[in-house]
Curated annotation (Swiss-Prot):
SUPFAM superfamilies: Nucleotidylyl transferase. HAMAP family: NaMN_adenylyltr. This is Probable nicotinate-nucleotide adenylyltransferase. Belongs to the NadD family. It comes from the Bacteria. It catalyses: nicotinate beta-D-ribonucleotide + ATP + H(+) = deamido-NAD(+) + diphosphate. Pathway: Cofactor biosynthesis; NAD(+) biosynthesis; deamido-NAD(+) from nicotinate D-ribonucleotide: step 1/1.
């Protein structure tokens, strides 16, 4: 069976930690492909100011262009209305029903995962992979959450310690506003694109 993963996010901007997560997932789960999906209008970020979707899409495209096992989809940014994870996963599952799908998201989502729209259906469509930003440690509350999800949905949450650098898109945007160096946080072409388009000033 073919294994593929979806890695969603606002990618505002995309940075090296995103790339590291994708590479780690490729090896860990024997994936044929990781599909990067820039978020359209996620319900939990409605009020947050975001860089226009076509610009975020272009940055992701530049960041992954040399890796044949990475691809990008504009499904969410072209879809009308709110960008629900269920709708995205359903779309890809219907396109490739025989593929074994993984959905990769951050550890911070674990606390409100059970409140996601159509979470039952999401667990039926894919394997849920949680990655840690600072080196994964199974704290007591995380262990309880895992057990709760296993009992309720009969699905095991997979965890991935990707040895991720301490990088976030918010940190990058703030450093740019402050006139600080950020080139080492992202692929060179993304950095040049940000400079050329005077982003995050």
């Amino acid at each position: 069976m073919i294994n593929k993963a979806i890695l969603g996010g606002t990618f505002d901007p995309i940075h090296n930690a995103h790339i590291n997560v994708a590479y780690e997932a490729l090896e860990r789960f024997n994936l044929e492909e990781v599909i990067f999906i820039p978020a359209g209008n996620p319900p939990h970020k409605i009020k947050l100011k975001k860089t226009p979707a076509h610009i975020r899409y272009e940055m992701v495209k530049l960041a992954i262009e040399k890796e044949t096992r990475f691809s990008i989809s504009d499904f969410e940014i072209k879809s009308k209305g709110l960008s629900y994870t269920y709708r995205t996963l359903k779309h890809f599952k219907e396109k490739e029903p025989e593929t074994n799908w993984y959905f990769i998201t951050g550890e911070d989502c674990l606390s409100y995962l059970e409140h996601w729209k159509y979470i039952d259906e999401i667990f039926n469509i894919c394997n849920f992979v949680i990655f840690s930003r600072e080196g994964f440690k199974e704290k007591e509350e995380i262990i309880k959450k895992k057990k709760s999800i296993l009992l309720k949905y009969r699905k095991e949450i997979l965890f991935m310690d990707a040895s991720i650098l301490d990088i976030s898109s918010t940190k990058i945007r703030n450093r740019i506003k402050e006139g600080k160096e950020v080139s080492f946080y992202m692929p060179d072409k993304v950095y040049k694109f940000i400079l050329q388009n005077n982003l995050y000033k």
